[in-house]
Amino acid sequence: YLVERRELLAGQGEAAPEKIPEIHLAPSKLIPVDGTLLRKLVGDKTPEGDATEMAHALYNAVDGLMKYDKPEANAGWGRGDALWACDARFGNCTDFHSIFIGACRDLKIPAKFEMGFPIPEKTGSGEVGGYHCWAKFLSNGRWEGVDISEADNNPNLKDYYFGNLTADRVT
C-alpha cells in the first residue's frame, strides 16, 4: 500500500462541521460525563479560559496522573474505562485518552477518539506492532490532536504532543 504521511500541526486540524454531532459531548458506557472525571482529575481547580487553554490544562493533568503501563497481572487496562483508569493511574493510550475525552466533555468541549496504527518512521521498513489511539478536541472550529500516552513515554516531546501529531500514523 502507498500511504501519504502528513504531520498534524497545531491550529491546522481538520475543519469541523458547523453542527457538531452530539456524540462528541455525550457520555458512553465507559466514559461518564457527569463531572465525576473532572473532579477526580483536577479536584476543585476547574480549568478556565478558551477551549485550547482548558484542554491544555486537562492534558497536563492526565499526564501528571497517569503512567503508561500494561502489566500482564492486571486485566483492567486497555478498555478505555475512564473511571477505572483514574483510580488505577496507569494504562495504555485508550485509558489515557478516555480520561481526557471525558474531562473535555465535562467542560462542554467536544472531544473524540481517533483509532489507527503507528507506522515506522522510516518509509519501507519495520512492522506495525498493534493499534494506537489519539484524542482530538474541538477548538476554533478545528479538531486538534493530542497524544498524552506518547507524551508520557517521551517527556521531551510533551509540549509537541499537545496539538501536534507525527506523520508516523495511519488513521
Which role fits each region the language model picked out?
Residues 71-75, 93-99, 132-134:
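A broad, low-specificity signal for short, low-complexity segments enriched in glycine/proline
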Residues 58, 89-104:
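Active-site nucleophilic cysteine motif
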Residues 98-171:
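Hydrophobic/aromatic-rich core segments of domains that either
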Residues 49, 84-91, 95, 125-126:
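A short glycine-/small-residue-rich loop at the edge of a beta-strand within enzyme catalytic domains
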Residues 1-87:
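Acidic low-complexity segments
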